């Protein structure tokens, strides 16, 4: 860490590995804070995704991280992604995963998804002062530099009763209808 501690995280462009985290919301402290079931669900989601979706052999998991901060300095949105899986494709190098154990309100879950849209829309200026420059999406310039599109967001609803999952999925789908990023809403069994 040392010399890199004050610098922003490196982009994935350096060899299909996610940048190291400066802080992590996992481990013994997270379990003591009551986040143990959430951590187990995140791990279960990563395993389910690799066992089902990646089993076809068309895509390959090269790395993953949990609790990845996607803060954009003081001016932009700040959110922590439950899991980021490095699954390089032609248009994107990662998949983003948000899990809901059924504990978030419908409004809060919809706001989290909307925060991803804000993050995708945040732009930065590139060019010398006094020249004709251009703006680029922050995520494309500084984080996922080999991606043509903002990474797909998977919202995974952790298993409870089937009718409750279906109701929650339908409600979230209605709440985020028309959003400008790709959002897949599913439960762990249907992943």
What are these regions (language model features)?
Residues 1-23:
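Accessory beta->alpha helical hairpin/"wing" motif in late/C-terminal subdomains of nucleic-acid enzymes
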Residues 16-191:
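Electrostatic, structured charged patches in enzyme active sites and in nucleic-acid/phosphate-binding
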């Amino acid at each position: 860490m040392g010399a890199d501690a004050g610098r922003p995280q490196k982009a994935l462009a350096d060899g299909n590995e996610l940048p190291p985290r400066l802080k992590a919301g996992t481990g013994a402290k997270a379990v003591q804070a009551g986040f143990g079931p959430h951590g187990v669900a995140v791990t279960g989601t990563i395993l389910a995704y690799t066992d089902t979706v990646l089993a076809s052999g068309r895509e390959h998991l090269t790395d993953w991280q949990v609790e990845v901060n996607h803060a954009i300095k003081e001016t932009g949105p700040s959110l922590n992604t439950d899991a980021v899986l490095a699954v390089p494709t032609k248009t994107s190098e990662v998949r983003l995963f948000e899990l809901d154990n059924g504990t978030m309100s419908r409004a809060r879950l919809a706001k989290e998804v909307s925060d991803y849209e804000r993050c995708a829309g945040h732009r930065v200026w590139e060019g010398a002062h006094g020249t004709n420059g251009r703006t680029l999406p922050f995520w494309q310039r500084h984080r996922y530099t080999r991606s043509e599109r903002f990474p797909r967001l998977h919202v995974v609803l952790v298993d409870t009763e089937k009718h409750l999952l279906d109701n929650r999925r339908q409600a979230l789908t209605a709440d985020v209808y028309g959003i400008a990023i790709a959002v897949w809403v599913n439960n762990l069994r249907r992943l």
